Amino acid sequence: LTDKTLHDGYIEYTLLYDMIANRITIDEVKAENGGLRLMKNLTWEYDALPHALICGGTGGGKTYFLLTIIEALLQTNAQLFILDPKNADLADLGTVMDNVYHTKEDMIECVNAFYEGMVQRSEEMKHHPDYKTGENYAYLGLPPCFLIFDEYVAFLEMLGTKESMSLLSQLKKIVMLGRQA
């Protein structure tokens, strides 16, 4: 699904077609101007739509897709925070980059710190001399920040009810601040 248009009395859905012909190689996946080119005819405009959910069946390529996104974002000034509760493929990135977490305590601390950082950044943006209502971090020349959470549902299952609710609350707040900060 690439677009959904509400018309008088019906909804028009636009679907992506001919995916194989429109594929690009991993080295062609580029992050530029607030967007990430994923296919010849598909760009994720993360400045405008900052949230992404990647899902698929076991062995469907989700982890390689995430690694491709991470590799492209590392070529920019983006700040990445990666959480891998299964201590699997994404956790291995901790040997070559900072801000990669896999233990319960470190992951919870990262989510909390990420939220606090967004709140602080939002306040700093409001005091920036070029601040303008309705604009986001990119307007002020700030780097994008990404919280990449692999298998977050599996992580929630590892937590007790109180911890799980607290983490979900923080994630909801992060989503709310998403595009602005």
Residue ranges and their predicted role:
Residues L1-Y13:
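Long, basic/Gly/Ser/Thr-rich N-terminal segments
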Residues E12, R37, G134-Y137:
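Polar low-complexity intrinsically disordered regions enriched in Ser/Thr and small residues
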Residues T14, D18-K126, P143-F146, Y152-A181:
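P-loop NTPase catalytic phosphate-binding loop
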Residues K126-A138:
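Short, glycine/acidic-rich hinge or "gate" loops at secondary-structure transitions
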